[in-house]
């Protein structure tokens, strides 16, 4: 008997998932996509299986704006285990070295200012970065170590929350591309004892905070109670991740031409930069960029939600 193909729903929006421990970002995405029965889905930057916390999941038209969330600043809380280093930089790796820990809270607090602001990081071998089409983590698992170029990132916030024995809890606010494992390893080396990430929780992704998230258990319960459509109440608007951008309103006439690819003028447009665009009915219709001549050029358009 031929298998009946599942007809997926055309739904759009963002679900803020509190990613559970042990899930890859893609596994979490596919689980929620199945519960929602969504046609199109994508996430906005990977969290390691060891990590939990804010993972924006984009569905339908919202996937067109996932790159802008990927580029946004992030916030984390991490537990730094001092006295050991591992081959992965976290608790899942093999211990490479064990050293005595002779530092305390005062030593850590005195050191942290060195790691605030613009810093240089060498990405870890256990990362999704690619070399000749191969992810570095696959090369690392095969025992290979390749040279990686240092990259500049910015640490906007770095505070010591707790320190007990050989463990310290840190609060970190950082730019895109920051590796918390590398940050913790570098701090450990500067302390002279080595360190790895024992726990990691993302508390912020762009404008989204942990308090706004929903758990996988809550989504599963909603699905059990009411099916796919019961999850629609957890969907945020497709432009939720762009709330810091100016909103420009177009007349019915201008919106028609803008949606057909033409740059138009708007009286409330800023002088430059990226903007959200809505039509005369206050319906979000896409994002645009204000050019030097003051016109708004369409960059990504969406279908009606």
UniProtKB/Swiss-Prot annotation:
- Pfam families in UniProt: TruB-C_2, TruB_C_2, TruB_N
Q: Does the keyword Isomerase apply?
A: yes
Superkingdom in the source lineage: Bacteria
Q: Which family does it belong to?
A: Belongs to the pseudouridine synthase TruB family. Type 1 subfamily.
Name of the molecule in the record: tRNA pseudouridine synthase B
Swiss-Prot/TrEMBL GO biological process terms: mRNA pseudouridine synthesis; tRNA pseudouridine synthesis
PANTHER family, A to Z: PSEUDOURIDYLATE SYNTHASE TRUB1, TRNA-PSEUDOURIDINE SYNTHASE
Q: Which residues cross the membrane?
A: none
Q: Which NCBIfam families match?
A: TruB
Gene3D superfamilies for this protein: Pseudouridine synthase, PUA domain
Report the EC code(s) recorded for this entry. Answer: 5.4.99.25
Task: Write out the catalysed reaction.
Answer: uridine(55) in tRNA = pseudouridine(55) in tRNA
Q: Which InterPro entries match?
A: PsdUridine_synth_cat_dom_sf, PsdUridine_synth_N, PUA-like_sf, PUA_sf, tRNA_psdUridine_synth_TruB, tRNA_sdUridine_synth_fam1_C, TruB_C
Q: So what does this one do?
A: Responsible for synthesis of pseudouridine from uracil-55 in the psi GC loop of transfer RNAs.
Q: Which GO terms describe its molecular function?
A: RNA binding; tRNA pseudouridine(55) synthase activity
State the UniProt keywords alphabetically: Isomerase, tRNA processing
Provide the active-site residues from the annotation: 48
